[in-house]
From Swiss-Prot:
Belongs to the kynureninase family. Keywords: Cytoplasm, Hydrolase, Pyridine nucleotide biosynthesis, Pyridoxal phosphate. The gene is bna5-1. This is Kynureninase 1. Gene3D superfamilies: Aspartate Aminotransferase, domain 1 (3.90.1150.10), Type I PLP-dependent aspartate aminotransferase-like (Major domain) (3.40.640.10). The lineage of its organism: Eukaryota, Fungi, Dikarya, Ascomycota, Pezizomycotina. Its cofactor is pyridoxal 5'-phosphate. It comes from Aspergillus clavatus (strain ATCC 1007 / CBS 513.65 / DSM 816 / NCTC 3887 / NRRL 1 / QM 1276 / 107).
Length: 486
């Protein structure tokens, strides 16, 4: 489904023009890469916080600084994406429709509308979201929040028996995923100590999970496992798992496979339909730029979303069991209020309540930009710009060998095994000092205690010059931290 990058680039990354070019360490070289970047124009489609904004203690627009602001270095799209310029317009149009139409806004069309009437906004979100994750439109629903959606999906896909009751998950999964899996196992009266299989790194100095190790874990627990739930991209290390291979192998053992795509959607070129993934869920406030806590999304493969109307009211199951709500019901009968639930086919049949139209406007404002850019082009730039970041981190300054640097990169070096993010592990005792210098220079990244920072150039709004400036400041921060530590 959707567009794909050339196979060689997916496997090995693109040819990097700066590997043997000493000019790559100059700001002019970074600026030349920006001048050639086909996505460079999208930077102007986002609101970049200024250095002054980051220090302000008020939000009153009448107290804006008089002089021209200096943009910050925002490399934190893996945590919270920046606001598209168009978001304000989308929300203003929604507020106007609500103000002028009230309840009739659910059905009234407008000649200049940015979204359909309230009753159909979820369909608009699914239409734009599907190509981003490589899905059919019917396989995607924009709804809920990430952990809520994981529970909704596991309520349907995790149907444990005395023989098959385990869920396999990475040992350092994002805590909310861990809690969700643990509570699902408890909910079905199993003990998580036995029912929860945690995949840990084989080498604790290298916190990534080799595909072969994951495959062996699946084989070891195959006869007793019901579901495997992994992160498409691991939030801490930035590792991009081999979704296609892991999914196929687990399914060959009779295991249902789900993926948390929070750090993958809008970041890498997913093909959830073609990879035969059973189910997936993701948030939209990271690379998809919908705002804090924005409406999330889920994926249900078409084979699981079928509704057999001929079996309704028979002893056979006409559709997959699920937690049900009125917004997942057949649109033709939704407002009859007859309490006879027949779901819409596909992922839409897993919806519970009508979506927040306010939130959906913020989601769609960003998704329209992805439609213009395409995931293939976004991934292509991501491979280049994150490769450039890695090159500068490891090789600048020229007189410092990488083994003598006060940090290591724990994200896989193979571009096919990562997205935009690089996770950088500092030597003990340096993190707070480094963060202080970065903050003083209006560099926005995030940290994971005790010693890791995560840096993620977002292809739609970050530039090669951003990356060059970050590496310069980061080197300075490391030198100051080493002196402060003594």
């Amino acid at each position: 489904m959707g567009s794909r990058l050339h196979t060689r680039e997916i496997q090995n990354g693109p040819p990097l023009p700066y590997n043997d070019d000493i000019r790559a360490f100059s700001k002019e070289y970074a600026e030349s890469l920006d001048a050639q970047d086909p996505l460079h124009r999208f930077r102007n489609e986002f609101v970049i916080p200024s250095k002054e904004d980051l220090k302000r203690t008020t939000l009153d627009p009448n107290q804006e600084p008089e002089h021209s602001p200096t943009p910050s270095l925002y490399l934190c799209g893996n945590s919270l994406g920046l606001q598209p310029q168009s978001t304000r317009k989308y929300i203003e149009y929604y507020l106007r429709a609500w103000a002028t139409k009230g309840v009739t806004g659910h059905f009234v069309q407008h000649d200049d509308q940015l979204l359909p009437p309230f009753v159909d906004v979820d369909a608009a979100g699914a239409r734009l979201m599907a190509p981003i994750v490589g899905a059919m439109e019917s396989e995607v629903a924009v709804m809920g929040t990430l952990t809520t959606n994981l529970h909704i999906l596991m309520a349907s896909f995790y149907q444990p028996t005395q023989e098959r009751y385990k869920i396999i998950i990475e040992g350092k999964a994002f805590p909310s995923d861990h809690y969700a899996v643990e509570s699902q196992i408890k909910h079905h009266n199993f003990d998580p100590k036995d029912g929860m299989v945690l995949i840990e790194p084989e080498d604790h100095t290298r916190p990534v999970l080799d595909t072969e190790h994951i495959i062996r874990t699946i084989d070891e627990h195959a006869s007793s496992t019901a579901v495997i739930l992994l992160s498409a991209i691991q939030y801490y290390t930035g590792q991009y798992f081999d979704i296609k291979r892991i999914t196929a192998h687990a399914q060959s053992k009779g295991i249902l496979v789900g993926w948390d795509c929070a750090h993958a959607a809008g970041n890498v070129d997913l093909q959830l339909h073609d990879w035969n993934v059973d189910f997936a869920a993701w948030c939209t406030y990271k690379y998809l730029n919908s705002g804090p806590g924005g409406t999330a999304a889920l994926f249900v493969h078409e084979r699981h979303g079928r509704v057999n109307l001929e079996q309704v009211n028979s002893e056979s199951e006409p559709f997959r069991p699920r937690l049900s709500g009125w917004w997942g019901g057949d649109k033709k009968t939704r407002f009859l209020m007859d309490n006879n639930f027949i779901p819409q086919p596909g992922a839409a049949g897993f919806q519970l309540s009508n979506p927040s139209v306010l939130d959906m406007n913020a989601v769609v404002a960003s998704l329209e930009l992805f439609k213009q850019a395409s995931m293939a082009e976004i991934r292509k730039k991501s491979l280049h710009i994150t490769g450039y970041l890695e090159h500068l981190l490891l090789n600048y300054p020229l007189d410092t060998p990488s083994e003598k640097k006060p940090f290591t990169i724990i994200t896989p070096s193979n571009p096919a095994e990562r997205g935009a993010q690089l996770s950088v592990r500092l030597q003990p005792g340096l993190l707070d000092h480094v963060l202080e210098t970065l903050e003083d220079n209006a560099v926005v990244i995030d940290e994971r205690k005790p010693d890791v920072i995560r840096v993620a150039p977002a292809p739609l709004y970050n530039t090669y010059t951003d990356v060059w400036e970050f590496c310069r400041i980061f080197h300075e921060a490391c030198q100051k931290a080493l002196k402060a530590r003594g």
